[in-house]
């Protein structure tokens, strides 16, 4: 029981104290209400739905009191929206656009006219749903895509069920593409049914309202609760969902094994036009659907709600693989599933050719977004991790809709032409064209060893800032977790994973690459940066010193590269391996026998790898730093003391000494090494392999000959 309201299927999150602090600020209450609604993915999807409020304001030119509508702007998300995510428009001007409306065939031209109705010039651009709110008189309005409501809206008998369930208190508007005309249809429905508390949109979603932010919030929850309770009762009455289980899901550990083994193969196939990032989901809802008797009937039908198929494509690809299939031979697996991808691309091309108009945009990437693996789970692939994850969330919503619709009646998807007209809508294309240009490393996954701090963290940060998903790893768990938190705050949780890894332990390395494949679908860039330094004379070196240096530097580089190469070969997309070596690989000096020779081993191993991996389009290059003076582990383990002793100076004098001995008289920072690594992978040196880039300020003895 919440404030007198009892809800079983939705979350009542309203906090009277927080709302009281916003008393008198209707726009602030709109943002608050929107965030509450967007926090529950059962109510609306990420980026989906919109809310509004109408308030009195003073016109800055006439000084007259006018009615202004604040509504979620284009491209926003209710759960995270702030005041800056709202558009503010004159209500009277919006409604007056009816006088210049030329009919449904011309409704797209109305969008440009919204700009002539803007009240706050600093507000967000209006969305296509703006007139849907403007033509309704209510002060506060919510438009959501709740799974339970869409289950009714997408069922064969949706209109009759709506009228019976709500006894006429919720209206019905048949499916129609969002836009100016749909706003007029909502007004017509309300005019014909005065006193209703909401309107169900066929195959789309729900409109509800109230005179205050709180009234609208509660009304919205109550209508959705009624839908959800009805759907649940019908599920219980009808027994088996999705026709019952066709096959049993593998145990969780086995599902994960199949997923991380298969993901790089799928990623390679999905990336035939541009590199894609993967996501894997195997929650109970997904498992029930992919393991069901009705999967083969329902999945090809596609989704109903526009927000769903805009994110997931017209339908998913279903893999014809046994849950426990042997996936160890990537070539055989690819040979088996490649025909399914070919058939999917042909299906998508036929869909495009059969539905396109003279002015339709060119066909987009024909590869699937959602891939269903019976017995295992669901993969999704998109241009970045967030988009891939959200696509999975949207398809899970679609599963919920299909489950509910099948329980109460029969699920119906949108006709192909209607779906196409949404997907290739010129307004949708214009929105895509306005999106920022992809960064150089967008769609790439980079693993940087020793990235809890120092050079490794700087490299990972540079890659993340250029659009890559990054896998941080370090043997120091505390340092790694601190780096993960820092990266998550700066770049978002989706684009970073932190995995503890010991580069000297093959099982630890393999496990890290498996986790990376599960998280992102595979790997594109590996930077072997993990290292230590020990400075002693030959006489003072111990066998343990020698073994430790060679294990971490030479063996570690080999083990990580070997595991990464296996993943890259599965993908068939090439790749980059960058080895952080050292000036000391090429320059002899005192008290440096073990470290310098281990670095030399790294350097020659790099050349050998480059010679071998060329046919796989895997490039191997080296960056040779020297005397990185900031936040580097090179100063631990007695290295600084050893080098200072060798040069006859104090530790405090080392930075200046190192800078002065360079030709450029410059100190070297971790960011300098990061920039050098980016130079190899940023797109300008795609035909370079086996090369060495010195980042040492200019040390003549280290010039390569």
PLM regions with names:
Residues 2-446, 458:
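Glycine-rich flexible loops
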Residues 566, 611-612, 686:
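Alpha-helical segment proximal to the catalytic Tyr-Lys
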Residues 614, 619, 688-690:
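Short, small/polar-rich loop/turn modules that mediate ligand/substrate recognition or access, typified
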Residues 582:
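Residue(s) in the substrate-gating loop at a strand-loop-helix junction
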Residues 561, 598-601, 606:
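Active-site helix of classical SDR
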Residues 689-705:
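Short C-terminal tail/terminal secondary-structure segment
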Residues 537-538, 542-550, 658:
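Substrate-binding pocket helix/loop in short-chain dehydrogenase/reductase
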């Amino acid at each position: 029981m919440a404030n007198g309201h009892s809800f079983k299927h939705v979350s009542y999150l309203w906090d009277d104290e927080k709302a009281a602090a916003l008393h008198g600020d209707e726009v602030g209450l709109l943002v608050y209400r929107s965030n509450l609604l967007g926090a529950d993915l059962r109510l609306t999807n990420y980026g989906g739905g919109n809310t509004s409020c109408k308030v009195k304001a003073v016109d800055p030119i006439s000084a007259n009191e006018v009615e202004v509508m604040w509504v979620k702007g284009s491209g926003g998300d209710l759960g995270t929206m702030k005041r800056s995510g709202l558009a503010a428009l004159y209500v009277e001007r919006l409604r007056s656009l009816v006088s210049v409306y030329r009919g449904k065939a011309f409704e797209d031209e109305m969008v440009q006219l919204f700009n002539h109705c803007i009240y706050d010039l600093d507000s967000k651009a209006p969305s296509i749903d703006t007139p849907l709110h403007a033509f309704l008189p209510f002060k506060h309005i919510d438009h959501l895509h709740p799974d339970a409501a869409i289950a009714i809206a997408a069922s064969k008998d949706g209109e009759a069920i709506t009228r019976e369930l709500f006894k006429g208190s919720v209206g019905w508007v048949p499916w129609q593409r969002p836009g100016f005309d749909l706003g007029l249809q909502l007004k017509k429905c309300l005019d014909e049914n005065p006193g209703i508390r909401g309107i169900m949109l066929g195959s789309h979603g729900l409109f509800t309202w109230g005179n205050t932010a709180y009234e609208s919030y509660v009304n919205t929850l109550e209508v959705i609760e009624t839908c959800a309770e009805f759907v649940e009762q019908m599920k219980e009455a009808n027994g088996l969902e999705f026709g019952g289980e066709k096959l049993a899901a593998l145990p969780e550990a086995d599902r994960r094994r199949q997923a991380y083994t298969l993901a790089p193969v799928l990623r390679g196939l999905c990336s035939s036009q541009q590199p894609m990032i993967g996501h894997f989901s195997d929650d109970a809802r997904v498992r029930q659907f992919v393991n069901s008797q009705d999967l083969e009937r329902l999945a090809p039908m596609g989704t109903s709600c526009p927000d769903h198929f805009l994110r997931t494509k017209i339908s998913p690809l279903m893999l014809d693989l046994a849950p426990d299939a042997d996936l160890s031979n990537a070539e055989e697996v690819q040979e088996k599933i490649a025909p399914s991808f070919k058939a999917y691309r042909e299906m998508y091309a036929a869909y495009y050719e059969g539905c396109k108009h003279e002015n339709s945009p060119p066909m987009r990437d024909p590869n699937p977004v959602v891939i269903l693996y019976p017995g295992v789970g669901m993969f999704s692939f998109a241009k970045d991790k967030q988009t891939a994850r959200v696509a999975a969330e949207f398809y899970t919503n679609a599963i919920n809709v299909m489950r509910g619709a099948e329980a109460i009646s029969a699920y119906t998807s949108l006709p192909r032409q209607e779906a196409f007209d949404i997907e290739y809508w010129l307004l949708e294309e214009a929105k895509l064209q306005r999106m920022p240009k992809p960064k150089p490393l967008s769609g790439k996954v980079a693993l940087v060893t020793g990235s809890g701090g120092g050079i490794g963290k700087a490299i990972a940060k540079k890659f993340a800032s250029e659009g890559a998903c990054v896998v941080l790893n370090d043997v120091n768990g505390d340092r790694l977790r601190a780096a993960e938190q820092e990266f998550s705050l700066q770049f978002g949780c989706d684009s970073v994973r932190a995995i503890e890894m010991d580069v000297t332990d093959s099982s630890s390395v393999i496990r890290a690459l498996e986790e990376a494949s599960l998280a992102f679908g595979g790997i594109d860039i590996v930077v072997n940066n993990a290292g230590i330094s020990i400075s002693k004379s030959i006489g003072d070196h111990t066998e343990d010193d020698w073994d430790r240096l060679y294990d971490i530097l030479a063996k570690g580089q080999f083990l990580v590269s070997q595991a990464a190469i296996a993943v890259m070969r599965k993908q068939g997309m090439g790749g980059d391996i960058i080895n952080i070596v050292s000036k000391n690989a090429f320059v002899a000096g005192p008290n440096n026998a073990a470290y310098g020779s281990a670095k030399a081993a790294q350097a020659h191993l790099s050349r050998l790898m480059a010679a071998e991996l060329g046919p796989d389009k895997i490039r191997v290059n080296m960056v040779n730093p020297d005397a990185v003076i900031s936040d580097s582990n090179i100063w631990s383990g007695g290295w600084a003391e050893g080098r200072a002793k060798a040069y006859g100076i104090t530790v405090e004098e080392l930075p200046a000494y190192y800078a002065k001995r360079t030709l450029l008289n410059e100190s070297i920072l971790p960011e300098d090494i990061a920039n050098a690594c980016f130079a190899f992978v940023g797109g300008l040196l795609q035909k370079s392999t086996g090369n060495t880039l010195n980042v040492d300020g200019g040390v003549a003895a280290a010039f390569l000959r």
